[in-house]
From Swiss-Prot:
Bifunctional enzyme that catalyzes the enolization of 2,3-diketo-5-methylthiopentyl-1-phosphate (DK-MTP-1-P) into the intermediate 2-hydroxy-3-keto-5-methylthiopentenyl-1-phosphate (HK-MTPenyl-1-P), which is then dephosphorylated to form the acireductone 1,2-dihydroxy-3-keto-5-methylthiopentene (DHK-MTPene). It comes from Caenorhabditis elegans. One of its GO terms (molecular function) is magnesium ion binding. The keyword Magnesium applies. This is Enolase-phosphatase E1. It comes from the Eukaryota. Pathway: Amino-acid biosynthesis; L-methionine biosynthesis via salvage pathway; L-methionine from S-methyl-5-thio-alpha-D-ribose 1-phosphate: step 3/6; Amino-acid biosynthesis; L-methionine biosynthesis via salvage pathway; L-methionine from S-methyl-5-thio-alpha-D-ribose 1-phosphate: step 4/6.
Amino acid sequence: MTTTTIQFNALLLDIEGTITSISFVKDELFPYAFENVGNYLEEHYDNPATQIIVEDLRHIADQQAENDVAVVRIREPRKECIEDVTKNVRHWIKRDKKLTPMKALQGLIWEEAYQRGDVKGHVYPDVLPVLKIVENRKIPIYIYSSGSVHAQKLLFANSIEGDMTKILYGYFDTNIGLKGESNSYTKISERIKIPPSEILFLTDVEAEAAAAKKAGLQTKLVVRPGNAGLTQEAINAYGTIESLEEIL
């Protein structure tokens, strides 16, 4: 835990394990997408957005089928295409692959889930009060997650705390780069026009904290129930917090 006041002019937040419980993502969102991917494709196959995703997934499948026997090449006919995409997406979900078009498809599936009221986005109780204080200090708040920007917005628009999107300035996903690569954080700094040293990044993942720190950002590791354990080396290098209140 940290007791010193942290000075920052932008707040960059991971989602899963940081402001949202890992169990919500792992035990609710991912299984929902896993179970409903085929049904969604059946209902929305001819939608232009769906077709773009399918084509992107076809290219990825062609590449990965060379080295992964569980990945099938996606056939052209509608019925076979849906079968193949469903099989691949379920395989990638099991492997926790960070594939941008798959994340986009998951986002579309979750959009329906939120609209139907099947799910509500979980946030820890300390999150919204702290973000309101940060916003009142005129400090912009950004989200950076491997989930698509679309999925991020859905979660915060349909959270158990209500619509939180009004206090969030922007969102980043794997289109800006992978979270374990320092260049991604450099790009975010350039995009929001705030020097890296003035950005505070909160995450529960050591590799992400390392990448952000390498890019010059301030970092803290967030400790939440159910999160993976942290090495003593990481705790010493980045420090930990157990509540967002500790950044105030």
